[in-house]
């Protein structure tokens, strides 16, 4: 069964559609902005390059040329999950920037996948039997030793990282974690009407 690299981006889109006022909805514009990124990436990444070179170039484009980034002082705000803000301001949080990278990777047929790491979303690139991990905060590669330190920081000294912590994410678990993060962000900012709308949207989806 083919892995759905675009699942997290689809959930980001659902979040936008569920909390946005109808008169403010501009889904065609969002599709246009994302489509433009895909076209630019295809133009900048030669088809004849190998996957390692393509992935490196994609990260350079996204975090370098296009200036997508996380702001250490503001990354936790709900706006960093809101597609128009992310695409216009080029700012997000690891899960939203990671969702965009995954969407672009799928469009370019590049083997980048999400990892449901305990501290935040991590990406893994699988090329020629090798795995490299990418921090969507910065687009930089992160070693297993660095991930082990993050794991110990979250769970205490001596905590042992498990293979499943570095594996491709289970999609339902990944989506559930995103939804909880989105709800928490809205409630923390006391955007209660938006949180209610989002919860109603999720409940309606369950009924379907």
Give, region by region, the residue ranges found by the protein language model.
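A structural boundary/capping signal
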Residues: 1-208
């Amino acid at each position: 069964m083919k892995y759905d690299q675009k699942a997290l981006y689809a959930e980001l889109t659902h979040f936008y559609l569920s909390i946005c006022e109808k008169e403010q909805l501009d889904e065609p514009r969002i599709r246009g902005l994302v489509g433009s990124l895909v076209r630019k990436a295809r133009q900048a990444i030669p088809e004849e390059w190998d996957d390692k070179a393509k992935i490196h170039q994609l990260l350079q484009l996204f975090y370098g040329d296009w200036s997508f980034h996380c702001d250490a002082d503001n990354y936790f705000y709900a706006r960093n999950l809101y597609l128009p803000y992310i695409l216009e301001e080029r700012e997000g949080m690891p899960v939203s920037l990671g969702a965009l990278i995954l969407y672009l990777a799928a469009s370019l047929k590049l083997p980048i996948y999400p990892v449901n790491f305990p501290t935040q979303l991590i990406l893994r690139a699988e090329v020629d039997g090798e795995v490299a991990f990418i921090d969507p905060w910065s687009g930089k590669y992160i070693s297993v030793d660095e991930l082990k330190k993050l794991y110990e920081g979250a769970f205490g000294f001596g905590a042992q990282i498990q293979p499943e912590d570095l594996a491709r994410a289970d999609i339902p678990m990944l989506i559930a974690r995103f939804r909880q993060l989105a709800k928490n962000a809205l409630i923390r900012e006391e955007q209660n009407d938006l949180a209610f709308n989002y919860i109603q949207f999720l409940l309606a989806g369950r009924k379907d």
